Design a protein with these regions (language model features):
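Preference for long, amphipathic alpha-helical scaffolds in soluble/luminal domains
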Residues: 128-132, 146-431
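C-terminal motif of bacterial Sec signal peptides marking the signal peptidase cleavage site
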Residues: 17-20
Length: 431
C-alpha cells in the first residue's frame, strides 16, 4: 500500500515526526513520502551535565531497551542512542531517519514515535536537546487509522498487525528450528516465513538467514522413506505439503524424487479422488508421470469441490502445483468454482473458518469482502472477536470450529493478507 501524501496541518506533521531528523522529515514506508518543514534549531538552553534515560518499546509494547547515559559523554540524543542501541537509520547531510532500534519493527503504517518526558516530542532525534533527568521513550504506534482521522485502518486491522508481529517474533522463532516434520503445522510456518522473506518484513522481525536455514534443515531431515506413513494422517496431500515447502526454499529434491518414484511404481489405486491432483501434479513436475499406471489415471476419478470446505485448502495447494495436466488427465479447479463453494459455506460456522480464509487469499480476494453470517460480520472481525485471546495474543483452536487445524494456518493467511494490503499487490498464498 502506498502511503498517502497528506496535505495536513503542522499539528499532524508534528505528530508523525517519528524518530527523524529535525528538518525535511520523511516517512520510511511506501513509494510516496510525507514531508514536513520542522525547524532543526532550538533556542532552549539546557545543562551539559547529569544523565538522561532512553527506553525503546517494540510493536508488542515490550520494553526491548533501557539505558541511562551521561550527558557529558553523550551530549546529544542521537549520540547516546547510536552508542547504546542497535540502530538502523537512513539520511543525508548529518540527519538521521531511524528505521529500527534493537530490531524493533517500523512496519507499514506504524511509526517510531519519540516521547520526551512522556510528552510527544515536537521534533525528531536530531532536533532534541537533552537535559539532566530527561526520559526519552521510543514507541511503535499506528498512525494510519480511521479513528485518528488520517487513515483507513480500523481497530481490527491494527489488531491484525499486532498479532502477526507477535507471531513472527515468538512462535516462528521457537518452533521452526525445533521441528522435525514438515507434514503439519511447520508447513504453514514455511508459508509465513516465505511471505516475510519475499516482502522484506524479515529484516525487522528476525534474522531471515538463520531461520530459513533452520527451516531448510528441518525439511531436509524429514523422513521420506515411507511417505504415506510419515504421520498418523499422511496422505498425498501431506506429501504435497513437504514437496511444496521444499520447492519454496530451494531444497535438494534428489532423495525425494527417488523415494517418490518408488512410491509411484507401487501405486495401484488412489485412496480417494481427493488425493488425485496432488499425486498427478508432483509427478508431472518431477517428470515421473510415466510411472503412473493408466488404470490409476482413470478419468472418472476426478477431484471435485464436493468434499466440503475441509478440502478447500488442500485443493488450492493442488491447483498451485498443477502445471501441465490437461483435461484428459485432470479436471482443473476454477476460481469461480472455489468462489462459489466459499459463498455456499457462508453461515456454516460448524466448519473451521480457517478454510474460508485460505482460498480467499489464494484467489487474490479481500477476506473482509465476504460475509460469515447473516449480520454481515466480516471474517477478520469474526476471528478476533470469537477466536482470539487478546491477552495472550493467540488464536484458540478449539473455537475455530470442526477440524484439527493449527493456528499456524490462520497466521499464514493473515500474513499473506497483510502483505497484500500493505504493498497493494496481489499475494497468492499457494504459489
Amino acid at each position: 500500500m502506498k502511503k498517502r501524501l497528506f496535505a495536513a496541518s503542522m499539528a499532524f506533521g508534528l505528530a508523525i515526526v517519528l524518530a527523524s531528523c529535525g528538518g525535511d522529515n520523511q516517512t520510511t514506508s511506501g513509494d510516496v513520502k510525507t514531508t514536513t518543514d520542522l525547524d532543526k534549531t532550538t533556542t532552549e538552553t539546557k545543562t551539559n551535565s547529569g544523565s538522561y534515560t532512553i527506553e525503546v518499546y517494540d510493536l508488542d509494547g515490550e520494553l526491548v531497551g533501557n539505558e541511562t547515559l551521561s550527558i557529558e559523554e553523550y551530549p546529544s540524543l542521537w549520540e547516546g542512542l547510536n552508542a547504546k542501541f542497535d540502530v538502523e537509520a537512513t539520511g543525508s547531510d548529518g540527519s538521521h531517519w531511524l528505521t529500527s532500534i534493537n530490531q524493533t519493527v517500523v512496519d507499514k503504517s506504524w511509526s517510531l514515535m519519540i516521547y520526551e518526558n512522556d510528552t510527544l516530542a515536537s521534533t525528531g532525534v536530531d532536533g532534541i536537546v537533552v537535559d539532566n533527568g530527561d526520559k526519552f521513550t521510543f514507541k511503535n504506534e499506528c498512525w494510519n487509522t480511521v479513528e485518528s482521522g488520517w487513515g483507513s485502518m480500523d481497530s481490527y486491522e491494527v489488531l491484525l498487525d499486532q498479532a502477526v508481529y507477535h507471531y513472527a517474533k515468538t512462535k516462528m522463532k521457537t518452533s521452526i528450528a525445533s521441528s522435525t516434520s514438515c507434514f503439519d503445522s511447520t508447513f504453514w510456518q514455511s508459508i509465513s516465513l516465505y511471505n516475510m522473506m519475499k516482502n522484506k518484513y524479515d529484516s525487522n522481525l528476525f534474522n531471515v538467514n538463520s531461520y530459513s536455514d533452520a527451516y531448510k534443515e528441518s525439511i531436509t531431515n524429514a523422513n521420506l522413506d515411507d511417505l504415506r506413513n510419515a504421520t498418523a494422517w499422511a496422505t498425498d496431500a501431506n506429501i504435497a505439503k513437504w514437496y511444496y515447502a521444499a520447492r519454496l526454499f530451494d531444497t535438494d529434491l534428489t532423495k525425494f524424487k527417488e523415494v517418490y518414484g518408488t512410491y509411484l511404481d507401487s501405486l495401484t489405486t488412489y485412496g480417494s479422488e481427493y488425493e488425485m491432483p496432488f499425486t498427478l501434479s508432483i509427478a508431472k513436475e518431477l517428470e515421473l508421470d510415466n510411472k503412473i499406471k493408466d488404470d490409476v489415471k482413470n478419468p472418472t476419478s476426478r477431484a471435485s469441490l464436493q468434499y466440503g470446505t475441509d478440502a478447500l485448502a488442500w485443493q488450492i495447494t493442488g491447483m498451485a502445483l498443477y502445471t501441465t495436466l490437461d483435461d484428459s488427465e485432470f479436471s482443473p479447479f476454477t476460481l469461480d468454482a472455489i468462489n462459489a463453494a466459499v459463498n455456499d459455506f457462508g453461515a456454516d460456522l460448524s466448519t473451521s473458518v480457517a478454510n474460508v480464509l485460505f482460498p480467499l487469499v489464494a484467489m487474490n480476494k479481500n477476506p473482509r469482502d465476504f460475509a460469515l453470517d447473516e449480520s454481515n460480520t466480516d471474517l477478520i472481525k469474526y476471528l478476533f472477536d470469537n477466536c482470539y485471546d487478546k491477552e495472550n495474543q493467540e488464536f484458540l483452536t478449539e473455537k475455530l470450529g470442526a477440524g484439527d487445524y493449527s493456528s499456524n494456518q490462520i497466521y499464514a493467511s493473515l500474513m499473506a493478507y497483510k502483505v497484500q494490503r500493505d504493498t497493494g499487490t496481489g499475494v497468492i498464498l499457494f504459489a
